């Protein structure tokens, strides 16, 4: 299925949704690779259905459409909730930001997606360094947890758990770097490749991160690579004031 065929499918689905729900739908837009125009033969169709509120009975759906053989991911969200999300810089921001700024409107009589983009861009512009640092610190703490899981699982010979932990840690490292550099990613693949090429966390990080992602590397070597990438990120955090540690229990009170 090509780009134009996906757009026709989106238009057909939007028409059906409007017939069913009418004025409860504020806007419908395509996001992801189709909205950016870089979709390929196997790309999914991602749709955001914006509603007037939680009372609108539009359900989230992620289904494989047998004909033409394509995954359609439909997410329904109230307009106010979507705008609130767009105005928040959180731990997932590098991967979440694309959907706020890259929408291809299929139905948008009130210009909702323009407003969504404006709200998000204003939030990014107005957010101080401490906002991005706090979000990066949250991800870094999660990375430390997965790093410990990966090391423990590898030592115990539990390679399945070790591999799962390594993958989670790789994504979290990309989020830390993306937040530190204020870099939004198009998708997960872009996040991993961009992080592997970055110099933002120093040359030691980039080399270790590439080894971490190497599918031909032994799990033990990947765990070691994760440790080196972790250390580079901790050095970065200490230098740049990214909060991730507490001197004592009073920090939790």
Enumerate the language-model features and the residues they cover:
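Intrinsic-disorder-associated interaction segments
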Residues: 3-6, 89, 105, 109-112, ...
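Short N-terminal helix-initiation segments at or just after the protein's N-terminus
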Residues: 9-18, 107-116, 246-251
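Conserved short hydrophobic patches within well-ordered secondary structure
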Residues: 25-29, 116, 173-176
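Conserved NTP/Mg2+-binding pocket subregion across the NTase superfamily
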Residues: 66-157, 252-253
């Amino acid at each position: 299925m090509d780009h134009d065929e996906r757009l026709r499918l989106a238009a057909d689905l939007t028409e059906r949704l409007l017939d069913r729900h009418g004025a409860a739908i504020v806007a419908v837009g395509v996001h992801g690779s189709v909205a950016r125009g870089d979709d390929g033969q196997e790309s999914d169709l991602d749709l955001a259905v914006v509603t007037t509120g939680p009372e609108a009975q539009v359900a989230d759906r992620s289904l494989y459409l047998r004909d033409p053989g394509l995954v359609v991911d439909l997410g329904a969200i109230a307009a106010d909730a979507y705008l609130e999300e767009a105005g928040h810089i959180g731990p997932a921001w590098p991967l979440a930001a694309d959907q706020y700024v890259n929408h291809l409107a299929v139905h948008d009589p009130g210009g909702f997606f323009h407003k969504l983009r404006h709200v998000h861009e204003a939030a990014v512009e107005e957010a101080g360094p401490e906002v991005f640092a706090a979000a990066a610190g949250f991800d870094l703490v999660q990375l430390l947890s997965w790093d410990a899981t990966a090391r423990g699982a590898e030592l115990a010979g539990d390679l399945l758990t070790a591999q799962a932990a390594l993958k989670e840690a790789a994504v979290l490292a990309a989020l830390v770097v993306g937040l530190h550099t204020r870099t939004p990613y198009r998708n997960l693949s872009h996040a991993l490749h961009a992080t592997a090429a970055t110099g933002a966390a120093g040359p030691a990080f980039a080399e270790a991160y590439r080894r971490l992602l190497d599918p031909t590397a032994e799990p033990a070597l990947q765990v070691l690579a994760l440790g080196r990438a972790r250390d580079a990120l901790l050095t970065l955090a200490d230098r740049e004031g990214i909060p991730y540690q507490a001197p004592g229990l009073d920090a939790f009170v």
